[in-house]
Amino acid sequence: MGRRRFVAGAAAAAVGSLMDRALAAEPPAADGPLITKSIPSSGERLPAIGIGTDSFGESARGEIHAELARMSSLGGTVIDTAAAYGDSEALIGEALAQLGTRARMFVATKLVASGGAESLARSLARLKTGHIDLLQVHNLNGVTSLLPAMQQWKQEKKIRYIGITTSRVSQHAEMIASMRAQPLDFIQVDYSIANRDAAATILPLAAERRIAVLVNLPFDRASLFHEAAGRPLPPWAADIDVKSWAQFFLKYVISHPAVTCAIPGSTQLSHFIDNQQAGRGRLPDASLRRRMEQYWDNKSA
């Protein structure tokens, strides 16, 4: 798709199973320490790069196992899924059970108003786990009806944190209202170098109310790779340990002070590793973030 066409050499032949390749492959050189961010409501720290799984499906089973097999060695822990993502929860649960890594992972999933206790039970069963680290109201569908039940599940230790999500600018006003009215540990919102709407209102409010932030669509559904095709990284990208456009886009996102973790989607092991490397090394300061924005905004000049 967008990134597959953009990244050179994507057709390398696999030797052996994807799982064996993932476990045996030489880890990429790490540029500096792992970047972690604090969850304001608890102080627990999370790696700043996780993985989104809305495109996880049966046809990508091998790649999913390979990515989750490598996740621990690369320092990642945050896995975001949803009851609405087809086979995603079941495939994640199967992989983590086989790998024996569930205890080290931070698993987030989502429900909607029509779900409730039965939907939570199904998610727990599919994920093969006794608890969910973060349960979110999917696209704000049922905030007022679900949150009281979620508070009860939190007391019962079926879930650890509560959140709400959106991936649409058109829902930002509704999200802001919920952030002001509801006791939340997390929000999840769309934000990228090309889509900065959340930075004007939602991210400052999250910082003010001490709410952790997961960022979805940091690549704008791969459109950023189309726009970057044929364009070199700026020379100063090396100053923040950036070696690819994916890392450029992700370091921009996670360097915002209010952002806790970005969750880029990936169903190719090479892309997953590239994304995870953005969670190490130096981050841009406010001045360099503005320079990144200017470089991106002037890409057609």
Segments from the language model and where they lie:
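Glycine-rich, proline-tolerant flexible connector loops at the mouths of alpha/beta enzymes
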Residues: 80-95
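Glycine/proline-rich, positively charged
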Residues: 59, 112-197, 201, 207-214, ...
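Conserved, mostly hydrophobic/aromatic
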Residues: 39, 51, 79, 92, ...
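N-terminal secretory signal peptides and thylakoid transit peptides that target proteins
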Residues: 1-14
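Structured C-terminal cap/extension of enzyme domains
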Residues: 13-16, 201-301
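C-terminal segment of N-terminal export signals and the immediately downstream linker at the start
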Residues: 20-53, 57, 74
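Alpha-helix-loop-beta-strand connector modules within alpha/beta enzyme cores
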Residues: 93-108
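Active-site mouth loops of central-metabolism enzymes
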Residues: 52-62, 108-115, 239
